[in-house]
Amino acid sequence: MDEQEPAPKRGRRFKEQTPVQRALGLLVRREHSRKELNRKLLARGIEPDAAQAAVDRLTDEGWQDDTRFAAAVVRNRAGSGYGPLHIRAELGTHGLDSEAISAALAAFEGDWTENARDLIRRRFGEQGPTDLPQRRKAADLLARRGFEGNSIRAATRFDLED
């Protein structure tokens, strides 16, 4: 019998993606800040000038928007039980300036004190913290989660008639 050479593979040949296509691929999964998107493109081997040009183009075309990104992070983290101090710090790590962060937090339509109370209800039950050690634990939890002092005091007081 003859030994046959294997037939050449007829798989698809993928073109190398452009920097804009790679950035758009990241943005369709979730929102990214300009700094974060640029960093991820650089990590994928895109040249710095090409990465910056791709981010600029997607920003100009409305695919990337730091304001929209900040609002999404605020909504998501507030819904997960985090307070404004934690969210402000996280947005800072994403490279947003303080004005954009303040605007996103100001645009949040929820009530931070009510969010703190909801978190306490989930952790301590509907009656809330009943004695001083539980109130301290609740206050510590809220402080770790980034709530401000006024919200912590109001939430750990836990008078449902407030």
UniProtKB/Swiss-Prot annotation:
One of the record's GO cellular component terms: cytoplasm
Name recorded for this polypeptide: Regulatory protein RecX
Function: Modulates RecA activity.
Top-level taxon in the UniProt lineage: Bacteria
Keywords, sorted A to Z: Cytoplasm
Family: Belongs to the RecX family.
InterPro entries in the record: RecX_HTH_1st, RecX_HTH_2nd, RecX_HTH_3rd, Regulatory_RecX, WH-like_DNA-bd_sf
Location in or out of the cell: Cytoplasm
Biological process (GO), any one: regulation of DNA repair
